[in-house]
């Protein structure tokens, strides 16, 4: 049962996933890209999750052996990038991921694969020999977008996992969420950018909080967010500055702030 609405301006579907449904477990918001909800499972419960009310039971691309999801992508030649998301796709057994990508290999218009995952940060042991072999065998240029919000999430085991991922030829990027009381200072953001880059991960996005029900206490207003980026820009090289963005339903891309 969904909770009673308690946040003015909040929503159970803050980013418009429902309206962007292309098939069971397939979401397409932006031209040329399709997001495949591979699973509803995650290694941890992120309290600010924008899909906290998402119906993973009904909207799971693994249902029916991926057939509906893969067919929907195959039927649209404008899709040249597939994003594996969830949940966390790396929470699936590697043989299930092989099954999925074997099906995607049959689609000639796919040119890139992207994986959104938090597991290399919170469970670096997941980056094992079998996973590394699978990643290295993929036929597409690969981007792995990890998710760390604070420099303290990195340690030697995470560094080792990132080194193994880089060894597959993947481009490693980090996306973070700006969270009140967690990383809402210039110093915290600087530490995060520097620490992620030291691990071989390029800062990518700093998301403004998606206003889903139950997370408003983490919100940082846009004025402060922009001031934080200005402060960060005064301290760091440009390649260490993540893009400050907000996702709004119906927009053709993430909205820069």
Please report, for each region that a protein language model flagged, where it lies by residue.
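Short, flexible loop/turn elements at secondary-structure junctions
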Residues: 40-42, 88, 119, 150, ...
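Iron-sulfur (Fe-S) cluster-binding segments and ferredoxin-like electron-carrier domains
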Residues: 49-61
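C-terminal accessory regions of radical SAM enzymes
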Residues: 227-257
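Flexible, acidic/Gly-rich N-terminal and inter-domain linker regions that tether
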Residues: 1-28
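N-terminal pre-triad scaffold of radical SAM enzymes
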Residues: 21-50
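Surface-exposed cleft-lining segments at the edges of enzyme active sites
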Residues: 56-57, 86-87, 115
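Conserved AdoMet/S-adenosylmethionine-binding subsite of the radical SAM
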Residues: 67-81, 90-236
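Conserved catalytic-core segments centered on acid/base and nucleophilic motifs
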Residues: 36-37, 82-84, 89-90
